[in-house]
Amino acid sequence: MSNDESLKIETATLREKGNGISEERLKDCNVLIWWGHKAHDEVLDRTVNLVQRRVLEGMGLIVLHSGHFSKIFKQLMGTNCNLTWREYGEKERLWICNPGHPICEGLDPYF
């Protein structure tokens, strides 16, 4: 993706000042991809609040594996996000809530 000149891709890490996330950086962010594994509690509450505000303003958020237990995901979902595992052969359906968002281009209304 970094070869696509229409995209501006940046990274932010836990160890950077403010976890590498500021109002200024988020202002121009269309989609934030969040990956976290074990250090969820080390993410600053201020960072979580900044990201939540931008998501509520319309910024896209893609939370990757293990991010289900991140502070931002739990705050946005309003639950503790504890998971259990089961195998019942059930299907899960995902609905596109904002089909006009560029990240949804080419996707069916649900899958």
Regions found by a protein language model. Give the residues of each.
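Short alpha-beta junction capping motif
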Residues: R25-K71
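A generic short-segment signal for beta-strand/edge and adjacent turn/coil regions
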Residues: M1-D4, L32-I33, V63, C97-P102
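A general structural signal for well-ordered secondary-structure junctions
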Residues: L7-K8, L32, L61, N82
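Short conserved AdoMet
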Residues: S2, L56, D108
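An acidic, glycine-rich "communication" segment
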Residues: L64-F111
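Detector for Asparagine
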Residues: N3-D4, N19, N30, N49, ...
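Aromatic-Pro/Gly-enriched surface loop or interdomain linker
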Residues: M1-C29
